[in-house]
Amino acid sequence: MNGILNILKPPGMTSHDVVSVVRKKLNMKKVGHTGTLDPNAAGVLPICIGQATKISQFLLDGKKKYRAELTLGIETNTEDIDGEILRQREVTSSPDEIREAVLSFIGEYKQIPPMYSAIKIKGKKLYELARQGVEIERAERTVTIYHIEIIEIFKEKVIFDVLCSKGTYIRTLCKDIGEVLGCGGVMSFLLRTASSDFSLDTAITIEELQALENVEDILLPMDYPLQHMSKAIVKSAYSKQVLNGNRIYSNYLIDTIHEPIGQEVCVYLEKEFVGFGIVRNEDHNQKYIKILRLLFEKE
């Protein structure tokens, strides 16, 4: 079984908990998620099954969309409402000032990841160090906030939708907004509404998954989130060359290579998605596709 499940992770479960449920349901070991959601957050969590685990990096690289609630006037050690309160301050900013501060983060900005995160430094996850009372210096990361829509501002609460790049911590965004306003802030609610091409309206709950007799009925194809990529469709006569990882020349293809040098493409054998390649150029200016990753072994 190979494909992707769009799971609605409930609050109270870790992303790995969801993977464990799917493994048990399918009686398969080759199962993985595509981007950690905080245990207390809910939302879209694509789960890769079988050979689809080999494309998880492409899903990790995709944009994410969230609905979040920011509570101003509080600072905690975890940057969310569940952490130990470090400081409380009065919120004196007007709704217009709050709106301006929130929207000022649209674009690229440098974030310092929270200590309570799964990032590894020298082989140790930061949250493991944080639980031991150890805090270490973290390097800034450039993240991109593509869009923010403010849904409501009510006293110290701000509800907003945000579209952002991979690796963006919404907890840290909330903390940073609070710092700009001079009163501190924490994330008090988080729902991931989209991850790459997977959205909330097509996600299934754990309960719905457990009730299914045939999971393959809802399994999405491996290339479902890759529709934005160009396709290189290889003629069946050249299947051996592809599965051996050899170069793919234009005459191997149903159509010629139109893509520019350096562009990654999805490689198909007729209708079957078999891997990824990148367009390269030989010394005599003949384009070819170099195989980057095969999803299936040669039989």
From Swiss-Prot:
It is an enzyme of class 5 (isomerase). GO terms for biological process: mRNA pseudouridine synthesis; tRNA pseudouridine synthesis. Its EC number is 5.4.99.25. Gene3D superfamilies: Pseudouridine synthase. GO terms for molecular function: RNA binding; tRNA pseudouridine(55) synthase activity. The keyword Isomerase applies. The active site is at 38 (nucleophile). It holds the Pfam family TruB_N. Keywords: Isomerase, tRNA processing. It comes from the Bacteria. InterPro entries: PsdUridine_synth_cat_dom_sf, PsdUridine_synth_N, tRNA_psdUridine_synth_TruB, TruB_C. The keyword Isomerase applies. It catalyses: uridine(55) in tRNA = pseudouridine(55) in tRNA. PANTHER family: PSEUDOURIDYLATE SYNTHASE TRUB1, TRNA-PSEUDOURIDINE SYNTHASE. HAMAP family: TruB_bact. Belongs to the pseudouridine synthase TruB family. Type 1 subfamily. Responsible for synthesis of pseudouridine from uracil-55 in the psi GC loop of transfer RNAs. NCBIfam families: TruB (TIGR00431). This is tRNA pseudouridine synthase B. The gene is truB.
